[in-house]
Amino acid sequence: MSVDFVKIAEKWQKRWEEDKIFENPSKLKYTEQEKKDKFFITAAFPYLNGVLHAGHLRTFTIPEITARYQRMNNKTVLWTFGFHVSGTPIIGLAELLKKQAPETIWAYNKLHNIPMGELQTLTTPENIVNYFSKKATESFKKMGFALDWRRNFKTDDETFKKFVEWQFLKLKEKNLIVKGSHPVRYCPSCDNPVEDHDLLKGEEATLQEYILLKFKTKLNIEIDGEDKEYECIIPMATLRPETIYGVVNAWINPNDTYHIIKVYDEVQSQEEGSDEISLKYNGIWIVSKEASDKLKNQDRTVELIKEIKGEELVGKIVINPVNNKEVPLYPADFVSSEMGTGCVMSVPAHAPKDFVALRDYYSSINKELTDDELISLIKIDGYGKYPAKEIVEKMGITNQKDEKLEDATHTIYKQEFHKGILNENCGEYEGIAVRDIKDKLASDFINNNMAETLQEFSIPEVVCRCGEKCIVKTVKGQWFITYSDLEWKKKAHNWVDKMNFVPETIRMDFHNKIDWMKDKACARKKGLGTRFPFDKDWVIESLSDSTLYMAYYTVAKTINTNNILPEQLIPELFDYVYYGKGDINEISNNTKIPVELINEMRNEFEYYYPLDWRCSAKDLVPNHLTFMIFNHVALFDDEKYYPKGIVVNGYVTIEGKKLSKSKGPVLPIEEVATNYGPDVGRFYITTCAELPHDADVKFKEMEHARDNLIRFYELATELKDTEKTITELSTIDKWLLHKVHSDLKIINESYNEFQLRKIGTLFYGLTHNLKWYKRRGGNNNQLLKYVVEIWTKVLAPITPHLCEEIWEMFGYNKNNNYISNETFPQLDNSYINENCELGEEFIKNTMDDIRNIINIANIAPKTIYLYTADDWKFEVLKIMMENKGAPVNKMMPLIMKNAELRRYGKEIPKLINEIVKNGISNPIDEENILNDAKQFLENEFQCKIIVNGEDIGNKKRFAIPNKVAIYIE
């Protein structure tokens, strides 16, 4: 049978929209029971710089299905979407399209499926926002999302901007917004700080604070026409300042360009309100050309004296600032001028890479590296004085290109960090654990003018969407949200302890992120979005205007449908709506918003909040989701308004390839809806992988999912005219009812726990169950129709269009009784019959045993004799069931308490082991089950079946509970 999933979807989407079935009416007052019966779920809204793709489909379909399920559980569901357009990515895209950048044109034409004629109109941010908001809306509708579109908004809507302004006013009132200097990710081309959404590469990049250890040397330099010897600083960057005590040499790249520079620290005036900067001389430094540029961007003014090649420094001696030891500079082409300062400390006793590099260098000058030259600084259990040397020799690492060198480095560094203790060579720091020393050492070294700091990216390449390579820059006069505030962090930690997380394992990720959180730049000079209320030259950036908007959903319908103007949305209005503060009549008079509409907004917020579940992919854990928690605990005094739970799913790949908006693959949602039908896409994307795992979309598997849905529809079609009344039930009928209702328990749990893949597995299991049912002679069409009805409701949240079609075909859709609004089926314990299931499993296992014998003996059976175990063996099983949790060695004394069983004492130990191996389960009436299935077994094996007949071949003695003895004639 051919099923047109697209046509079916279009039919029901039109009907739903006409009848507005996903729009909840507003009420003047909600009862306490109604408040308990609400369900508010959201997903992180999409950024509109491209079409919605398979990654969006997975993340958004999870809450979509959950919303439909909760609606079928008689909940009043709020499920809606906004669109994110803030920041610079859309401006950057407009500029690239205006310039007709070939790669961008290709990506949006070929990957995003935008016709060239339409693409040529997308040269302004406004056109891009309008175009992609329409495309996103179409995508959601084509996939059949049960959204309340009355609450939709874009983050550049003037009404939403008023909400964001209010949010920032509240943060400022709580002293959580400050102005100052701070290192940030920065795009020199856009002249703006950049956030994750602004990046083409390196979204995961964080800032790492390196310690610059100030080694000194003497060098003849001509300055202002005078050539004389000057003291110069050669700073060396490290994340582990304690290793300075083990420095033997330093590495410099002879082929790179180095700058001799005068360095001045830029000192901010301490006078309140003053932006004045003074310069403080910090000496002559020698660093790589790239490092010179870094220093300029991090609170330093740099004056170039001279440019030299690294080879001019090879062989020079520098002085270790902590112990005044002489340290030679050796050549190394592995030193990158882009990392740190272009000069690297060498600690061969503890760094396997340094040990191998120094050994290789000595070999090149016919010298041998001896233990006398190594300096030990850390004690680790399991290693001697020189761990790097030990592991290199143990792993047989022969040179610097050996792949094992990376593993060796990781092993030693991990061991030292977790178990290492500083030794006597570290002076006053002897006895301190490595994991506890960094901050203290850094502070001491900086206070003694032996060190400074330098911020670097945690990964090598960070690229803005405009194509420019990003830098770390200390921005002065920048506005920050003070996420480093310890009291604020404490509140966030406390709430994370109380929240629900799916999967549970991510709870600790949130705790870690809260611990790591530093002050965050929250505004920029360029971009779409809300003007910073305290300084209109700035615009609130895209990860700061998207932390509380779930609260805006609750009032957006009232604002949108009543044409409330931005200027009417004054802070006092939001104070009343979200805090209940102020005089409603006075606010109404000042805003010209009727009292009943203000009450409606207040009531809607009070009714739907808190947010029950927030859904997102895992990339938003370290930013948006954590910021959401921070902002809620800061802006609401009562925990009853805090978000209750977060659901995080894995990423999506296409046939093993990572999704990429610029390089492909993309797989737009509309393509899925058009080529496969929305129900197929919804079913497949939510059941192809466990929630926390990455989902790899395979088109063959999607076709397989489609085929299974077609088979289900075919079965429904065959049964559409069958009467619903179920009369007498056979054993196999009871088994099928048991399977359906035992599955319902798992299904309801799975929906509530976001374990949607289990439902897919059970759906595929239904196919196998129905095959077994028919194979066992099941032919009760009334029962089959009942099963299909149950499963049509089960699938309705996932494949709503197909299920509406079946519901109508069964005649249940009269008067617009949509299945989407039906009550979800629940477990009926009266149908649960464990003995039925055990009996069918017993038959299947018996059949497997018979086949194994036939195959091994290579015989054609004429008669099969089946023998069940003696009664005393079932008594043993009964005792074992009663003591199922007891260790096996404790079973024998328990059984021997039974006087009747003692005479079988020699046989019982073997029986116990056999029962354990076969599985301890409730005894069943095996003889009756076999006799009931006798005709079936005879048909299966085309021979006579005799149950507990004459004991031919003395086989009966081998029978144990749940495993018959078999003799084949």
UniProtKB/Swiss-Prot annotation:
<dbReference type="InterPro" id="IPR001412">
    <property type="entry name" value="aa-tRNA-synth_I_CS"/>
</dbReference>
<dbReference type="GO" id="GO:0004823">
    <property type="term" value="F:leucine-tRNA ligase activity"/>
</dbReference>
<dbReference type="InterPro" id="IPR014729">
    <property type="entry name" value="Rossmann-like_a/b/a_fold"/>
</dbReference>
<dbReference type="InterPro" id="IPR004493">
    <property type="entry name" value="Leu-tRNA-synth_Ia_arc/euk"/>
</dbReference>
<keyword id="KW-0963">Cytoplasm</keyword>
<dbReference type="GO" id="GO:0005524">
    <property type="term" value="F:ATP binding"/>
</dbReference>
<dbReference type="Pfam" id="PF00133">
    <property type="entry name" value="tRNA-synt_1"/>
</dbReference>
<dbReference type="InterPro" id="IPR009080">
    <property type="entry name" value="tRNAsynth_Ia_anticodon-bd"/>
</dbReference>
<protein>
    <recommendedName>
        <fullName>Leucine--tRNA ligase</fullName>
        <ecNumber>6.1.1.4</ecNumber>
    </recommendedName>
</protein>
<keyword id="KW-0436">Ligase</keyword>
<keyword id="KW-0067">ATP-binding</keyword>
<comment type="similarity">
    <text>Belongs to the class-I aminoacyl-tRNA synthetase family.</text>
</comment>
<feature type="binding site">
    <location>
        <position position="661"/>
    </location>
    <ligand>
        <name>ATP</name>
    </ligand>
</feature>
<keyword id="KW-0547">Nucleotide-binding</keyword>
<dbReference type="Pfam" id="PF08264">
    <property type="entry name" value="Anticodon_1"/>
</dbReference>
<dbReference type="GO" id="GO:0002161">
    <property type="term" value="F:aminoacyl-tRNA deacylase activity"/>
</dbReference>
<dbReference type="GO" id="GO:0006429">
    <property type="term" value="P:leucyl-tRNA aminoacylation"/>
</dbReference>
<dbReference type="InterPro" id="IPR002300">
    <property type="entry name" value="aa-tRNA-synth_Ia"/>
</dbReference>
<feature type="short sequence motif" description="'HIGH' region">
    <location>
        <begin position="46"/>
        <end position="56"/>
    </location>
</feature>
<keyword id="KW-0030">Aminoacyl-tRNA synthetase</keyword>
<keyword id="KW-0648">Protein biosynthesis</keyword>
<dbReference type="InterPro" id="IPR009008">
    <property type="entry name" value="Val/Leu/Ile-tRNA-synth_edit"/>
</dbReference>
<dbReference type="InterPro" id="IPR020791">
    <property type="entry name" value="Leu-tRNA-lgase_arc"/>
</dbReference>
<dbReference type="InterPro" id="IPR013155">
    <property type="entry name" value="M/V/L/I-tRNA-synth_anticd-bd"/>
</dbReference>
<feature type="short sequence motif" description="'KMSKS' region">
    <location>
        <begin position="658"/>
        <end position="662"/>
    </location>
</feature>
<dbReference type="GO" id="GO:0005737">
    <property type="term" value="C:cytoplasm"/>
</dbReference>
